[in-house]
Amino acid sequence: MINMKFFNRVEEIKEILSILEEEPNLIYFIYGPINSGKTALINEIINNRLDKNKYVVFYIDLREIFISKYDEFEAKLRATKTFGFRLIIEVLFEEYEDDKKPIEIIRSLIKDAPSLCGIPTPKNTLEEILKKKTTKNVFKYITNILMDIKREGKQPIIIIDELQKIGDMKINGFLIYELFNYFVSLTKHKHLCHVFCLSSDSLFIERVYNEAMLKERVDYILVDDFDKETALKFIDFLSEEILNKKLSDEDKELIYSYVGGKPILIINVIGKLKHKNLKDVLNILLMDEISKLKDFLSNLDYIKPKVNIEEEIIEIRKEDIINALKLFKGKYEIEVDKIPKAVYVYLVKKNILFLYPQRGTLKPQSFLVWNAIKRVL
């Protein structure tokens, strides 16, 4: 694992810190392509940019919560409404054996940690909440804790990473809408708590963007792959950190032409240069991506892809998928209306394309995917 200082994201950090200085008013969705650095950005802010004397952060990473329980919850949610309620408990609360008041637990925990991984709740209190089996009691309990934090002179912040993992569960009238309604209450109505939701699922962001109940109640912060200028600076930064030298302009341009501004791919390339040749590293990455794309297209000869659009199941032809991908041979980003919705939904779900709902455009998930498209089609 390469350990290094955080790089750039000056504008995004400035924007988020500016939001935190004002009273809570909107739900903020921090979104962008896979591995563009969303979680790294929010961790940098939590760990190094916030005054612990002013803020109490609840950082809930659904990747950790659902890694072993997602399938189990999915099945139980389909079977009974009760487990929808239990899922919210599972997501938002952190159980403690201690019988101290939650605010006392919070005081002791934030001395040693920059953030908390859930709403700290004594075991006996949690058992009482579970007996009542209503989200109303859950949200009332959380609100009371947040108000206690405000009375202590601190500003609470709730951050949920990979929120779409709940959004995928289209059960009981969309469980996630109960959370949205509550977050609107915390921000727009009570001005009590800042709420940030992180997601790399652009279809989920599109659903949020088009949701009438959230109009004028949410805003968006895009954490995209680096542009070329920033990517080249990042390559300089990494090569000095990892290789103790600068790369030539020719080598930097070559790296960018293969992987673009995807931070994780640039890190991967520079890390391997300690013991491998640059062209070999880049060619292996590209060949791997080409192989994945060919395999994806080959599978379409044996399966009939389907997507759900407004409760209608739409079947997609291989020919339509190929025609859509060919549009990117000469262009990295295109207007969304150039591709039938069912086709782009399928390609986004497969992490081949990324959707920008606010721009109304699509692009490959990375330069590497783009290069594979140009060579295969």
Curated annotation (Swiss-Prot):
Q: Does the keyword Nucleotide-binding apply?
A: yes
One annotated GO molecular function: ATP binding
Checking Gene3D superfamilies in the record gives: P-loop containing nucleotide triphosphate hydrolases (3.40.50.300), Winged helix-like DNA-binding domain superfamily/Winged helix DNA-binding domain (1.10.10.10)
Q: Which UniProt keywords are given for this protein, alphabetically ordered? A: ATP-binding, Nucleotide-binding
**Annotated InterPro entries:** AAA+_ATPase, Archaeal_ATPase_domain, ATPase_dom, MJ1010-like_2nd, P-loop_NTPase, WH-like_DNA-bd_sf
Record keywords: Transferase included? no
Q: What's the family?
A: Belongs to the archaeal ATPase family.
Q: What is this protein called?
A: Uncharacterized ATP-binding protein MJ1010
The record lists the lineage as: Archaea, Methanobacteriati, Methanobacteriota, Methanomada group, Methanococci
